Amino acid sequence: TYFTTNQQYPLGIDLSVYNSSADGRRRPNFDLIAAHQPSVEFIAMRAGQSWGYRDPAFRYYLAEAQRIGVCILPYHVVFPGESARRQMDSFLRILAGVDLASVRLVLDLELDHGQTRSKITQTLNECLRILQAETSRLPLVYSRASWVNEHLSLRDLPELDWWLAQYLPRRSYPAYTPEFPCPPRLPEGLSVWRIHQTSERAPAIGGSGWYMDYDRWNGTRAELLAYFGRVDKQPAKVCPLDGLACPRRKIQPNSITAEQPIAMEVI
């Protein structure tokens, strides 16, 4: 089986239009994603890039992810040489109608476009400021340690939650590449990570395409849900008398109280 590494970390996947066929007819089946074991707890999905591109699959992914009840992270690819305001306005327009308190936004920082460290850091800071003003919290930032070390000045950034990529060397097609064991390599000056993108050539979940990106959450499932403002629903207590769900919260399994006489059939 593929799933032998990182099983203590909640599993996530991330999607873009490249996880659908070119004509849009074959798309990931979210019922299969919902039924998958180990369970997929969160899904990141590309919303757009810069100020002029919307991922055409985003709305489908968003609606389906909402339907199956997973935690959702819309992400936007930042072009560091372009206006932060135009890019974030585009991101927010794409998200029109989305309850921003129920999702976690992500800025994808992996393109330098020949810009200086100072310029890239400045653009990111402006994007952060705009999103914080609009949503009352900072987004996560996706990148990798080597890129951050070369292109960002962490001392000039606020404290952020980081989603970091690190993979094992690719195996030749059609083989799958195992997940990189958590934790990922951290940029210089960082000591914590929030999400680790562990593979870019993992088995596709949901029946579309061959490969898929996998991610792992640094914490428990309960901590993941709390991060998204959710409560982990506990299973209903089972009544020891009839085996049905019991509305009384304090009943103990396999216990019978004096107030609950048992009706016995006389043989």
Regions found by a protein language model. Name each.
Residues 23-24, 116-117, 151-152, 205-207:
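Short, solvent-exposed polar/charged micro-motifs at secondary-structure junctions
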Residues 80, 146-147, 203:
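Positions that flank functional sites
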Residues 103-183:
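Catalytic domains of cell-wall/extracellular-matrix polysaccharide-remodeling enzymes
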Residues 1-3, 61, 93-96, 148-153, ...:
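Intrinsically disordered, low-complexity boundary segments flanking structured domains
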Residues 1-135:
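Substrate-binding cleft of extracellular glycoside hydrolase catalytic domains
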Residues 2-23, 157-267:
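Functionally critical loop-and-helix segments that line ligand-binding/catalytic clefts
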